[in-house]
């Protein structure tokens, strides 16, 4: 069976990894992450359930998305803070600075 070249990437604030690998044609995004062995480098990473994307686009069903040659599978981390709450805090700070506080 033919093989295709893909990349699997994961990043923490202090450490990043980009793994290049060859996988059989027909491999899904989730399968590529499992085949990459990235979980060994990042203990605690839930490769079975973590959200995945390709070139910045979140995949709804990474188990079903068949990869094409040259694609980069990105492993996403959960958000640390609620984006709405962060915006509210930023707006409150800006308002307070404008009012001279």
Swiss-Prot record:
Disulfide links within the chain: none
Top-rank taxon, per record: Bacteria
Family: Belongs to the UPF0125 (RnfH) family.
Protein name: UPF0125 protein PA4766
Natural source organism: Pseudomonas aeruginosa (strain ATCC 15692 / DSM 22644 / CIP 104116 / JCM 14847 / LMG 12228 / 1C / PRS 101 / PAO1)
High-level lineage: Bacteria, Pseudomonadati, Pseudomonadota, Gammaproteobacteria, Pseudomonadales
């Amino acid at each position: 069976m033919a093989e295709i070249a893909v990349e699997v990437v994961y990043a923490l604030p202090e450490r990043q990894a980009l793994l290049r690998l060859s996988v059989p044609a027909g491999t899904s995004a989730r399968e590529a992450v499992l085949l990459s062995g990235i979980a060994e480098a990042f203990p605690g990473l839930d490769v079975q359930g973590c959200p995945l994307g390709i070139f910045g686009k979140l995949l709804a069903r990474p188990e079903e998305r068949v990869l094409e040659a040259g694609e980069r599978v990105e492993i996403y981390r959960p958000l640390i803070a609620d984006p709405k709450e962060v915006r509210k805090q930023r707006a409150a700070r800006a308002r307070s600075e404008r009012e001279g506080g």
